[in-house]
Amino acid sequence: MPVMDIQQIWDILPHRYPMLLVDRIEELEEERVVGIKNVTINEPFFTGHFPDIPVMPGVMIIEAMAQVAGILVLSSIPDRKNKLVLLAAVNEAKFRRPVVPGDQLRIEMKVIKRKSTIAKMNGVATVNGLVVAEAEMMCKLADRTDRV
C-alpha cells in the first residue's frame, strides 16, 4: 500500500499533467523517500523522442527525481500550500540505461545535507532493480508568492 497516492501527491506538488512525473510514494522517512513513475507510451515526450524508438529523455528522469525530492521536503512543512521547491542545481548526473514505455521507474532520494531553505540530495532511479540514472541535486524552498 502506498504511503501517498496520487490524490495526496496533488495536495503537495503544484505539478499537473503533462508535467507531473510521480504516480505514488512508497516510502517516506525524515531524510529519505521512494517514489514511483509508471512510464507509458502516452507520455507526450515520446511523440518526438524518438518516434520509432521511444526513450524517456534524461531531463525528464531528472525532473521526476526532483519532484520526488520536492515531496520529501514539502511533506514535513506545515504551511506547504504556500511553498514551492525549486531545483537549484544538478551535479554528477549519469544515465546508465534507457527508460522505455512499460517501465516502472523507482526513484530513491536521500538527504545529504539540509539547511533552512536548501536541501542537497543523492538520487538513484532504477527499473527492475537496475540503475538507469543517478544524480546529486540541490533544491531550494521558496514562497509561492516570490518571483522565481
Task: List each language-model region with its residue ranges.
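Beta-strand-rich interaction surfaces with strong enrichment in secreted/lumenal proteins
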Residues: 10, 52, 95-97
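Catalytic strand-loop segment that frames the active site of acyl-thioester-processing enzymes
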Residues: 17-56
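Hydrophobic beta-strand-centered segment that forms part of the acyl-chain substrate-binding groove
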Residues: 1-3, 69-106, 132-134, 139-140
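Flexible, low-complexity linker/boundary loops enriched in proline and small hydrophobic residues
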Residues: 2-24, 138
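Short solvent-exposed loop/turn micro-motifs enriched in small/polar/acidic residues
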Residues: 18-19, 92, 104, 116-118
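Active-site helix/loop of acyl-thioester processing domains in fatty-acid/polyketide metabolism
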Residues: 25, 56-79
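HotDog/MaoC-like acyl-thioester-processing domains
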Residues: 32, 100-103, 110-148
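Conserved positions in beta-strands of structured domains
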Residues: 23-26, 91, 96, 108-112, ...
